[in-house]
């Protein structure tokens, strides 16, 4: 009975792994994206003083999954805004300060440390950024994305104090 179980287990394992091995052999490097930290294509985020961004994968302006990195300079925070898509944020470097609501108030922000995660639900009003150190985030969303400022007259970014 034990021998039969072993044979069945090995057979099942082979059946599961064989297609994966064949798939790997057929797709060697096809579609993979590798970017080293020093090669990240940072650009100034349009309209956001003190913020840089880099599109890592996909295109936030088109339908489909996208991955973007955002870098806040020390002392820079966004003003209240929202996005049309859910966004999933992972803090890569620094402590990211996050607040919710229509009124910018850095004293009411909550820290998310490097390695931490936060979901921004579509349409949820929020503001975020850096206080005393540079912050780098990785954002994942489903395009088309965008940003709508709650108080456009206040600009997109400003001091975190």
Model feature map: region roles:
Residues 1-11:
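Bacterial N-terminal signal peptides that target proteins for export
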Residues 9-20:
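Bacterial N-terminal signal peptides
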Residues 24-66, 153-161:
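A short, N-terminal "cap"/entry segment at the start of jelly-roll beta-barrel domains
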Residues 31-33, 107, 127-161:
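Double-stranded beta-helix
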Residues 63-83, 111, 121-122:
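Conserved short histidine dyad/triad with adjacent acidic residue
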Residues 78-80, 98-99, 120, 125-131:
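Short beta-strand His + acidic residue motifs that chelate non-heme Fe in jelly-roll/DSBH
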Residues 96, 102-123:
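Short acidic-glycine-tyrosine-enriched beta hairpin
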